[in-house]
Amino acid sequence: MGLKLVQVDRDLAERHYDSHRGKPFFEGLVDFIISAPLVALAFDGPNAIAVVRAINGATRPHEAAPGTIRGDFALETAQNIVHASDGPEAAATELDLWFSADELHEYERDVDRWVLAPEE
């Protein structure tokens, strides 16, 4: 788990969007993410990626369901209000990019043994 407020510099932005380098919208993505501070979050838990993506809603705001972050607050796809990793490999890469080891914390909640199924 981790949380921090970040003013993203161009280098970090370009590394974050590296998979879009060379595409016509790359510079717009970089310019937008460096335009203001953002909150970087790292979640952990059962199905964390799927849960966060469901809370975020569809990438295109007009396709996002009401009650999701994008459905309620996003206006345009290019200036996306929220990002979530699309799978475990991307999550590992993005965690390394956005957080140092001392910024991530692990803990066990006592209630977890009562509400979470044991791992198989």
Name each region found by the language model:
Residues 1-120:
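Non-catalytic terminal and connector segments of soluble metabolic enzymes
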